[in-house]
């Protein structure tokens, strides 16, 4: 049985990833800032496996440390999904706006990777998947809302740097889920959550003998340009 941690697992893409991994028999830690909501979601979606809600604000060092101790050494999959979306244009952004976006969208994943990548390296196996965006890619000229694009570009850089520290069968990658119908994406988005979650779940569950994918950005199960 795999063990997976999904941040921001109480809604949207994160919720669907939790549901899909549970249906495959995994033990899933559903990370949520609001444990009341998180527990309600966990009860609603757990399937063949087991979903355990854990309190996690990714910007809280105390939460990250406590969770690392609770989970221990045997985490197989880390999905850094929690994120915030600031839609303000560049000319209206404050330093605090950009700081808040980066704290959640990049430094939160950095804290969790710093905790769990060494443990995965010691075991020689593990998958870390950062949920990014086309708005954070240089190939798309970091288009879209400025603070969001800056923070996702930083997350992409973190993915590349962390992948260079991955050993054995440990993989660190980023996924662009596309424009998905969630609270963040809105009702007009063309993709549903199952489409947004598909590549994440695929990376999390690929067999170890399927060829190593490491330090890449993927969309629809294919490597795309940063």
Specify the residue positions occupied by each region the protein language model found.
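Catalytic loop of short-chain dehydrogenase/reductase
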Residues: 84, 91-95, 127-167
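Conserved glycine-rich Rossmann-like NAD(P)H-binding loop of the short-chain dehydrogenase/reductase
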Residues: 24-40
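Rossmann-fold cofactor-recognition segment
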Residues: 46-62
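Canonical Rossmann dinucleotide-binding motif of NAD(H)/NADP(H)-dependent dehydrogenases/reductases
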Residues: 1-29
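C-terminal helical subdomain
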Residues: 167-170, 174-180, 186-226
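Active-site Tyr-X3-Lys motif and surrounding loop/helix of classical short-chain dehydrogenase/reductase
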Residues: 66, 88-92, 96-103
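Rossmann-fold scaffold of SDR-type NAD(P)-dependent oxidoreductases
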Residues: 7, 75-83, 130, 173
């Amino acid at each position: 049985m795999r063990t997976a941690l999904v941040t921001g697992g109480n809604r949207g893409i994160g919720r669907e990833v939790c549901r899909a991994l549970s249906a495959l028999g995994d033990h899933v830690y559903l990370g949520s800032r609001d444990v009341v909501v998180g527990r309600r979601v966990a009860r609603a979606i757990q399937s063949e496996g087991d979903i355990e809600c854990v309190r996690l604000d990714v910007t809280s060092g105390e939460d990250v440390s406590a969770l690392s101790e609770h989970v221990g050494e045997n985490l197989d999959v880390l999905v850094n999904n929690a994120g915030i979306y600031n839609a303000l244009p560049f000319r209206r952004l404050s330093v605090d706006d950009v700081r808040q976006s980066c704290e959640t969208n990049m430094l939160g994943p950095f804290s969790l990777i710093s905790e769990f990548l060494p443990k995965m390296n010691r075991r020689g196996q593990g998958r870390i998947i950062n949920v990014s965006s086309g708005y954070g890619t240089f190939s798309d000229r970091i288009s879209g809302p400025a603070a969001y694009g800056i923070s996702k570009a930083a997350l992409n850089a973190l993915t590349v740097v962390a992948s260079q520290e991955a050993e054995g069968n440990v993989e660190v990658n980023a996924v662009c889920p596309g424009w998905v119908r969630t609270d963040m994406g809105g009702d007009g988005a063309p993709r549903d959550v199952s489409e947004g979650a598909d590549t994440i779940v695929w990376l999390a569950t690929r067999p170890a003998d399927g060829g190593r994918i490491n330090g890449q950005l993927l969309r629809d199960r294919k490597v795309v340009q940063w």
